[in-house]
Design a protein with these regions (language model features):
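Short acidic active-site motifs
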Residues: 50, 218-222, 404
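N-terminal Rossmann-like NAD(P)+-binding subdomain of aldehyde/semialdehyde dehydrogenases
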Residues: 2-142, 316
Length: 503
C-alpha cells in the first residue's frame, strides 16, 4: 500500500494487506512535503482487484470477530492502544512529515489511544442497554427480544487535516461493535500509515479485521464497491460523489462534511475571553479544522474594541518556520487549499473588505504559510462569508440586535458547529439554542471533541448526513437491528378469518 524508499513493506502474515504491494510495477503517486513543497515520498495505489481481495479476506475473519463476546474485542482494542503508545514516536514523526506541524503530530497518537481506551470502557454498557426485551404493547401475548447484527465490513475514507485521528474516529467504535474495517486515508498525507500498520500487525486478532489501503479517488471507489457501510469525512463535493456511489449499491453512508461555523459575541461579553476564544477557534491548526470558526459576528458597540484586541493578539501568533519545534501554526498541508484561501481574500478586498493584519499566503522555504488574517467591513456577498475557508482567516462583521445576529449566523448552507460568547451562560444558551448547527460551544469555541463519547449531535444542512458519530450512536450506527418475536398463545386459525359480510 505504501511505497517510500524501499519497494516492499508486506508481512507474510497479512495477505489481505499485502496484495497491493505487487503494484510496484505500476505508476506511483507523488506525495509532497508541506514544509518544502518537494516530493519526498510515493505511494503505490492498489488495483480494484487488490481492494476486492483485501475486502474478501477481512470478511472471512469478521464472522469470528463478531461472534466473540464484546469483552474479547475490548481486550484486543486495548492491546492495540498499548502498541500505538509504544510506537508513538515513529507515528508522530511520520505525521509531522505529513502535516508540517510538530505539536499536533506529537499529540495525535495520544488522542487516538485516548479514543480507543475510552470507547473500550463505554462500549459494553452501550451495547447492553440497546438490547431490549419485553412484551408487545399492542398484543400482550407477543414477547420480543432485539438482536444487534454488525455490518460485516466498514469502509472509511478520511481526510488530510488530521490524518491519523480522523482515520480511526469511525473505525474504533465500528471494530468494537463487531465490524471489520478497511480504511483509505488521504493520498495527501499517507506517511503515518506505515508505522501505524506496524502496531496493527502486533495484535494478530486485530490484524485479521483491520487494514489500510492508500490511494486516490479510484481506490476510494473500489473501497465503496466492496464494503457494507461507508464513513466519509471531507468536502461537500466529494461527499456528494460518495453518497451517490453508496446509493447505487443501497448501502448506508455517514457523511461528516464542511462547515462555515459562526460565533456570536454579544455586547456583554468579556473582551479578553472573547478574543482568546475566537483566536484559538479560528487559527488553531492553521484553521484546517472542519469545525473551525470562520465567521465572527460582534455587537456594534464593542466591535472596534474587539477588533483592536484581536489584532493585537493575532500579531503575536508565530509561524513554525523555519523551526517546526517553535511557533504556533504550521503551513497549509495541501497547496490547493492555500490557493482557495487566497482567492477568498482577493474577492473580499475587491468587494470592500479591509485586512487589519496578516494577508495572503507566502512561500517560505517551499512551504505555503499564512499569518492570522483579520478582516473587517465584510458582508455576506463575499465568498469568505459563504464558502468554507479552511485557513487562518478571521472575518469580523458588526450586528445590531440579537435577532440580526442569529439571522446572520444561520445564513449559510452549512450547519456543523457554532459558538456564542456572552456576559452570562444563560444569555449564551438563549442564542446558541437558535443557531442551526449540530454542536454549539458556549463561552468558548470548538468544544465539540470534549463530549465525543457523551452526547450525540448531528450535522445540519450540507455539513453531513447519516446520524451522529458521537455518544452511544457512534457505536450503535454500525449495527443492523433485529427483532425476534414469540407468540405465547395458539396461532390464529386461518379458517376462522373470513371476509366480512356486506354492510
Amino acid at each position: 500500500m505504501v511505497c517510500p524508499n524501499s519497494p516492499r513493506h508486506r508481512s507474510p502474515r497479512q495477505p489481505h494487506e499485502a496484495v497491493s504491494m505487487t503494484a510496484i510495477r505500476r505508476n506511483t503517486l507523488p506525495v509532497r512535503n508541506p514544509r518544502t513543497g518537494e516530493v519526498d515520498y510515493h505511494i503505490t495505489p492498489p488495483t480494484a482487484e487488490d481492494v476486492a481481495a483485501t475486502a474478501k479476506a477481512l470478511r472471512a475473519a469478521q464472522t469470528d470477530w463478531a461472534a466473540a463476546p464484546i469483552e474479547h474485542r475490548v481486550a484486543v482494542m486495548r492491546k492495540w492502544a498499548d502498541e500505538i503508545e509504544k510506537n508513538r514516536a515513529a507515528i508522530s514523526k511520520a505525521e509531522a512529515a505529513d502535516t508540517g506541524r510538530y505539536r499536533i503530530a506529537k499529540e495525535s497518537p495520544e488522542a487516538v489511544v485516548w479514543g480507543i481506551r475510552g470507547w473500550a470502557d463505554k462500549a459494553p454498557e452501550i451495547v447492553k442497554t440497546a438490547m431490549l426485551e419485553g412484551t408487545s404493547s399492542i398484543m400482550p401475548h407477543i414477547k420480543f427480544r432485539t438482536q444487534l447484527k454488525p455490518y460485516p465490513l466498514l469502509g472509511v475514507i478520511s481526510p488530510w487535516n488530521f490524518p491519523m485521528m480522523l482515520s480511526t474516529i469511525d473505525a474504533t467504535p465500528a471494530l468494537l461493535a463487531g465490524c471489520a474495517a478497511i480504511i483509505k486515508p488521504s493520498e495527501v498525507t499517507p506517511r503515518f500509515v506505515e508505522p501505524l500498520m506496524e502496531t496493527i500487525r502486533k495484535v494478530p486478532d486485530l490484524a485479521k479485521v483491520l487494514t489500510y489501503v492508500v490511494g486516490d479517488g479510484a481506490t476510494g471507489q473500489a473501497l465503496i464497491d466492496n464494503v457494507d457501510i461507508v464513513c466519509f469525512t471531507g468536502s461537500v463535493p466529494t461527499g456528494r460523489k460518495v453518497a451517490e456511489a453508496c446509493a447505487r449499491r443501497f448501502i448506508p453512508v455517514f457523511l461528516e462534511l464542511g462547515g462555515k461555523d459562526p460565533v456570536i459575541v454579544t455586547e456583554t461579553a468579556d473582551l479578553e475571553r472573547a478574543t482568546d476564544a475566537v483566536l484559538r477557534g479560528t487559527v488553531y491548526a492553521t484553521g484546517q479544522i472542519c469545525f473551525s470558526i470562520e465567521r465572527v459576528y460582534v455587537h456594534e458597540k464593542i466591535h472596534d474594541a474587539f477588533v483592536d484586541k484581536l489584532v493585537e493578539k493575532a500579531e503575536q501568533i508565530e509561524l513554525n518556520y523555519p523551526d517546526m519545534h517553535k511557533g504556533h501554526i504550521g503551513p497549509f498541508i495541501f497547496a490547493k487549499q492555500a490557493a482557495i484561501v487566497d482567492e477568498q481574500l482577493d474577492d473580499a478586498v475587491r468587494r470592500g473588505a479591509k485586512i487589519r493584519t496578516g494577508g495572503k499566503s507566502q512561500n517560505l522555504g517551499g512551504g505555503l504559510y499564512m499569518r492570522p488574517t483579520v478582516l473587517t467591513d465584510v458582508n455576506h456577498e463575499m465568498k469568505v462569508m459563504q464558502d468554507e475557508t479552511f485557513g487562518p482567516v478571521i472575518p469580523v462583521m458588526k450586528y445590531n440586535t440579537k435577532d440580526e445576529a442569529v439571522k446572520l449566523a444561520n445564513d449559510t448552507i452549512f450547519g456543523l458547529s457554532g459558538a456564542v460568547i456572552a456576559g452570562s451562560e444563560e444569555e449564551a444558551y438563549e442564542l446558541g439554542a437558535q443557531i442551526d448547527a449540530g454542536g454549539i460551544s458556549l463561552q468558548d469555541t470548538t468544544l465539540t471533541g470534549a463530549i465525543l463519547r457523551d452526547a450525540e449531535k448531528t450535522s445540519f444542512n450540507l455539513s453531513g448526513m447519516g446520524g451522529s458519530r458521537m455518544g452511544p450512536a457512534s457505536i450503535l450506527r454500525f449495527y443492523r437491528k433485529k427483532a425476534l418475536m414469540t407468540n405465547t398463545l395458539k396461532p390464529q386459525d386461518m379458517r376462522e378469518i373470513r371476509e366480512l359480510p356486506a354492510a
